[in-house]
Amino acid sequence: MTMLDTVQHHSQPQSGVPQNHLADEFVETLRLAVPMMLTQLGQIAMITTDLALIGRLGEDAVAAAALAHTVYFVSFTFGLGLMAAVSPLVAQAFGAGDVRRIRRALRVGLWVALLISLPMMASPLYGEHILIALGQVPQSAALAQRYLNGLAWGIAPALGFIALRGMMSAVNRPQPPLWITVAAIPVNAALVYVLIHGLFGLPELGLFGAGLATTLVNLGTFLAVLAIAAWRKPFSDYRPLAHLWRIDWPLVRQLIALGAPISSSLLLEYGLFSSAALLMGLISTTALAAHQIALQVTAVLFMVPLGIGMAATVRVGHAFGRNDPAAVRRAGLVAAVLGVALVSALTVAIILGRYELGRLFFGGSEASAATVELTATLLLVGATFFIADGLQTIMGGALRGINDTRMTLAFAAIGYWCVAFPVAWVLAFHTGLGAVGVWIGFSIGTFVYAGLLVLRFRMLARRLVG
């Protein structure tokens, strides 16, 4: 079997259903999406474990870790967007049966991950100065810096892991990153605990130890997935590490052109939700607490459309690579229908259990009754937001599959900052709706964003068919 035959063999659907049937598209999308969802949930599990173990150091440590994550994730989000461009580039090459381009796209992704990680480390390593400049208490900023000093060095391997995960998903093999992430969860918990408290003769490192543990786990997961890519079939058939020293500058420019708008869109979204916390803080402490818990529920729910959106990138990219416009349209449609159906079902479950979710975090005491009530109200108001946010995530993924990210950035600016934030401000402070007004505003803005993405995909899909 030749290298081209290998690619074409692995590109075939794993079911026996003909490829041009909608049922097959549903199966293939789910087969890709489920491991991606679980991998993302695994990442959340590690972050949650870190915070739980840091919580044993006291409230000051938890507050410092929250500040540190704010600084870290602003920087990391930029790299995340660039690495998200690896998947569509590989998917298109895979659809076209171009082994060499698969290898080149991954190689460029790894080089870009390394090169951008160096300037990206500046923000975490100078996090204390940034936090003080933003008005944070110097003691909290100093504590946050300890955590960041350990965390910053894990940026490069974390980005490398994302690039390799994107390549594996794009060649229809998303399982290895999931296995590695699941294995890393207990390892991460043990390592964080040992380094925080200084067991087995090691020094007690506190917050620095928690950050260092995350860096070591990032390095370990990257090396594990790199080893699988290099030596395990079908990945080894693509010779992913061949000529690794060569930098393909035209492809670097293409990756940056595709990924930079993704990074900017993610930063606009991150900025919106950061501003939401500020708005809630202006309303009341109860509003801020209820908002944070509602967002935690949203974050878990978000993994479903995120996984489907990643799968949409791959499925649309495959069709685009093999020059099959009808399949491009079908892949986007199926992903949207599947995502909206699943998110709608989960949204109904959240609405029915909204009070129980509030009590899970705040307990059932009279003192927390008002916070539980507001949390339940926000989750009810958020029903439209959940569905719209899921749809925009999926359609954004589908558009990446056909290399359309610049208009997505423009739509994000319109939906988030021209609609969501102004409407949230007016409803919260000029109509007396308070926290509920913020969520209504965000729901309206996200709905506008999702609608624009749907129209954009339909227009481009029709243009491809035409």
Swiss-Prot record:
Disulfide bonds: none annotated. This is Probable multidrug resistance protein NorM. One of its GO terms (molecular function) is antiporter activity. Its main location: membrane. GO terms for biological process: monoatomic ion transport. It is a multi-pass membrane protein. It comes from Bradyrhizobium diazoefficiens (strain JCM 10833 / BCRC 13528 / IAM 13628 / NBRC 14792 / USDA 110). It is found in: Cell inner membrane. One of its GO terms (cellular component) is plasma membrane. Belongs to the multi antimicrobial extrusion (MATE) (TC 2.A.66.1) family. It holds the Pfam family MatE. Keywords: Antiport, Cell inner membrane, Cell membrane, Ion transport, Membrane, Transmembrane, Transmembrane helix, Transport. Multidrug efflux pump. The chain crosses the membrane at residues 68-90, 110-132, 142-164, 177-199, 209-231, 251-273, 288-310, 331-353, 368-387, 407-429, 433-455. It comes from the Bacteria. Signal peptide: none annotated.
